[in-house]
From Swiss-Prot:
Primary location recorded for the protein, binned into one broad class: cytoplasm
Record's keyword annotation contains Mitochondrion: no
Subunit note: Monomer.
Organism this protein belongs to: Shewanella amazonensis (strain ATCC BAA-1098 / SB2B)
GO BP: queuosine biosynthetic process; tRNA wobble guanine modification
Subcellular location: Cytoplasm
Keyword DNA-binding annotated: no
Gene Ontology terms for molecular function: S-adenosylmethionine:tRNA ribosyltransferase-isomerase activity
Name listed for the protein in its UniProt record: S-adenosylmethionine:tRNA ribosyltransferase-isomerase
Amino acid sequence: MRVADFTFDLPDELIARYPMAERTASRLLHLDGSTGALADRQFTDILALIEPGDLMIFNNTRVIPARLFGQKASGGKLEILVERMLDDKRILAHVRSSKSPKPGAEIILDGGFKMTMDARHDALFELSLKDDKTILEVLEAVGHMPLPPYIDRPDEDTDKERYQTVYNERPGAVAAPTAGLHFDESILAALKAKGVDMAFVTLHVGAGTFQPVRVDNVLEHKMHSEWAEVPADVVEKIRATKAAGKRVIAVGTTSVRSLESAAKASEGELEPFCGDTDIFIFPGFEFKVVDAMVTNFHLPESTLIMLVSAFAGFDEVIGAYRHAVEQKYRFFSYGDAMFVTKKAP
């Protein structure tokens, strides 16, 4: 397949640059993978689409304030976007500057915190903190929320809450698992009251999620690597859910990628997973774990629209996106959602 096959026309005014006033106020497009049928709904209708005994799996990563500003010793300004925290003192990061810093160069961040550039790994820089603070403490003190480029505005105080799920727990992501942004405490409580089971995996979303696909042939694309964990208790819940004939419903493409990474790494029965994954899901992929998913609307020609197309059918998903444009759904991270069931074999 060609990357250009996954394009669609999107008017700029449909890109959501702010969230709705209430998390659950978004719209929900239901795509039935078994029939290809579409239904326009409100997000709160998800309560009618999830059945007692179904297992919903969420990504509990926490977005860190990963964008830093500072200057080199020469006075030249630079911007740092953390890709990954290596430990309490070291990061891998993208650095934007008129001239790239050389190994040993000192960087002075806003707030006076100091870092040095230790090494370069292709497009990423390994930086170490020279203060008595930890990386997380410095990020919390002077970091900015790393809003996606298409939101096209500076981050604001409200983004610290709204570009974050209510169930976040483990710091490390530099982009939100956006399908989860629609859930608030009340709808989670209502799902539990209905008899829906819940579990949590972790995938620390990297800045690579915003990188465009730079090849023409889908098969030639190389995915960026991200750290993920599917714990043993989640595996046990999945096994029990499948044995009972109920569905595993992933909230977000990051949850999908975590679960299918565990399945790919397992020999035979699903096993726990912890480590880096660069799984690339595109049409032709055989899903082993996920039966349905909640997901936002993704960028044209992105690996995420490819993933959804693999799950529910290429023609069905492209048709759903065109319908969403016609019906003026809101797109991308702060936009509306889809509930998608797997296409019948």
